[in-house]
Amino acid sequence: MIDSTTELRPLTKRQQQIYDLIKAKIQDTGMPPTRAEIANFFGFKSANAAEEHLKALAKKGYIEMLAGTSRGIRLVEEMLEAEGLPLIGRVAAGEPILAQEHIEEHYKMDGNLFHPAADYLLRVNGESMKDIGILDGDLLAVHQTTEVQNGQVVVARVENDVTVKRFKREGNVVYLHAENEDFSPIKVDLANQEFNIEGIAVGIIRSGRWM
């Protein structure tokens, strides 16, 4: 069974080409290609050669092969997207924010409801951003990116801690401002401290309603 815990292994050049062809065919026609169509496209001598490449893609976790049909190919990424947005709870020090152990569940929502599209939801912990309506327990919709402008609300990692704050950069210093007068800004010296942007806030979900 293939699920969201599947660890994808790198593809060979030919495997990547076949994977890209499958995606393109699905986007253009709504259907994956047959083995014969794959063989014809790449000049293989038989459909069996295409079958072997498909088996390799399935073994590496990129597709699922369905028995009994010539077009029995399903992209795993589409299956995972159908689960909804991953909801991230507490993030362990030093671990990637989307590490499987951080995902509490998948929230049945289309990320394209937000602009730019949300890639995951982060459960808000604390009241440091309450003055702009981001409250403890809210689900913050986050677009995963490392590109950020001054004034944007970001999910940032300072050393091993993940925080939601308003971003401002001045030279080699970043200030992460709370939206609550009880909290002082976090000053980050980029020359001496580890700092990463995990994404920008694009919306809030509270009690099942997006805002």
Swiss-Prot record:
Question: In the record, what lineage is assigned to the organism producing the protein?
Answer: Bacteria, Pseudomonadati, Pseudomonadota, Gammaproteobacteria, Alteromonadales
* EC numbers, comma separated: 3.4.21.88
User: Self-association or partners: how does it assemble?
Assistant: Homodimer.
Q: Which family does it belong to?
A: Belongs to the peptidase S24 family.
Task: For this UniProt record, give its keywords in alphabetical order, as a comma-separated list.
Answer: Autocatalytic cleavage, DNA damage, DNA repair, DNA replication, DNA-binding, Hydrolase, Repressor, SOS response, Transcription, Transcription regulation
Portion annotated as DNA-binding: 35-55
Q: Name one GO molecular function term.
A: serine-type endopeptidase activity
Protein name per Swiss-Prot or TrEMBL: LexA repressor
- Is the DNA-binding keyword given for this protein? yes
The processes (GO biological process) annotated in the record are: DNA repair; DNA replication; negative regulation of DNA-templated transcription; proteolysis; SOS response
